[in-house]
Amino acid sequence: MSTEIQKIEDNNLKESQMWNSKELKEAIKEIEKMFGKGSIMVLGQSDNLNVETFSSGSLLLDNALGIGGYPKGRIIEIYGPESSGKTTLSLHAICEIQKLGGIAAFIDAEHSLDPKYCHNLGIDTNKLLVSQPDNGEQALDILEMLINSNSIDLIIVDSVAALVPKTELEGEMSDQSIGLQARMMSKALRKLNGLIAKSNTTVIFINQLREKIGVIFGNPETTTGGKALKFFSSIRLEVRKSENILSNSEIIGNKIKIKIVKNKTAIPFKTATISLLYNKGIDKIGELVDLLVSYEIVEKSGVWYSYQNEKIGQGKTSVIQWLNADEKRTNELIQQVKKIIEQKE
C-alpha cells in the first residue's frame, strides 16, 4: 500500500514540475506573443470554451438539441425537400436573436425573401440586414466581410443550391461545370470556419436535396455543394413535412419532423416534430402544452387536463385557451420548462 502511495506522490511531483517548467512557460509566452492572447489556454480554466446558445424558436427543438438551442460561433446546416419549412425555421432563429438584442443578416441567394412573412413571424425588418448577391463567390465574400466585422450574431444563407459559381453563370448552357460549386464551397468553408469561431457568429446554411444517379442500394438522396459543409457543420438538421394540420376540415398548417443527423455539442439522432401554422410559423403555445404534459407540470387524465389539482378543461384546445388568457402565467411556465431543459443538458 505504501508503494502505491509513493508512486502517486512521485507522479504528482512530476506533474507539478512539468507545469512549472521554464521551457513550457517560455513556449506559451512565445505562442501568445506571435498569435495573440487566448491562442493557447488550459481547457478547464477557459470560459471561452463553454458553448453559448440561443433558442431556435421552438421549445421542442431546443430540447432535442440537448443544449437548449443553437450554439454560437458554429456552422449549422438545415436541409430537406422543397417546401418542408427550412426557411421558416431559420427565420425563427433570427426572431430569437433580435429578442436578445443581437444583429442578424440574411444572404438571399434565391432572391425569394418575403418581408411581410418575416413581419408575421415577429422579425423586426428594420433591423435585419439583407443581401441578394449575383453569384456564389459574391455571396461568400459578403459572408466573410460580415463575419470579420465581429458585429453580427447570426447569418442565414438561403440557399447553398443557389450559390452558383461566376464561371457557370458567365459560360454557355452547354458548358460542363462538374464540381465547380463543391470546390467553391470547400475553399470558402476552410477559410471561414476559424473566423466564425473567433467572431462567435452563428452561420446557418439552408440546403436542398438532390438524387444521385444510378444508386440501387442505400439512400439516393444527397445535399448540394459537396461534402465540405457536412464536415464543417457542428449541427445538421434534416427537415421533412409530416402531416397536415386541420381546423374544421381546412388545412391551416403542417407538422414537420426534424432529425438531428449530426450534433457535435450533444447527443445526435434525436427528433422533434413541430407544428408550422401558415403565416404564423411555429405553434409555440401548442408545443408548450406538449412539454408541460411531458414534464408533468400539467396533468392529463384521459381527455381532461389539470394544473395544480385544478381542472383546466377537456382537450388540448382548452389548455391553449387557458394559456392565452394569462400571459404572465404562460411566461412563468415557459421559464419553468426552459429550466428543466437546462438541467437535462
UniProtKB/Swiss-Prot annotation:
UniProt entry tagged with the keyword Kinase: no
GO BP terms: DNA recombination; DNA repair; SOS response
What is the recorded function of this protein according to its Swiss-Prot or TrEMBL entry? Can catalyze the hydrolysis of ATP in the presence of single-stranded DNA, the ATP-dependent uptake of single-stranded DNA by duplex DNA, and the ATP-dependent hybridization of homologous single-stranded DNAs. It interacts with LexA causing its activation and leading to its autocatalytic cleavage.
Q: Which GO terms describe its cellular component?
A: cytosol
What are the protein's UniProt keywords?
Answer: ATP-binding, Cytoplasm, DNA damage, DNA recombination, DNA repair, DNA-binding, Nucleotide-binding, SOS response
According to UniProt, the name of this protein is Protein RecA
- Its chief place of residence is cytoplasm
Q: Which PROSITE patterns did the record assign?
A: RECA_1, RECA_2, RECA_3
Which NCBIfam families does the UniProt record give?
tigrfam_recA
Listed binding positions for ATP are G80, P81, E82, S83, S84, G85, K86, T87
Q: Which Pfam families match?
A: RecA, RecA_C
Cellular localization per UniProt: Cytoplasm
Give the protein family. Answer: Belongs to the RecA family.
Q: Which GO-annotated molecular functions does the record name? A: ATP binding; ATP hydrolysis activity; ATP-dependent DNA damage sensor activity; damaged DNA binding; single-stranded DNA binding
The record ties this protein, via SUPFAM superfamilies, to: P-loop containing nucleoside triphosphate hydrolases, RecA protein, C-terminal domain
Q: Domain of life of the organism in this record? A: Bacteria
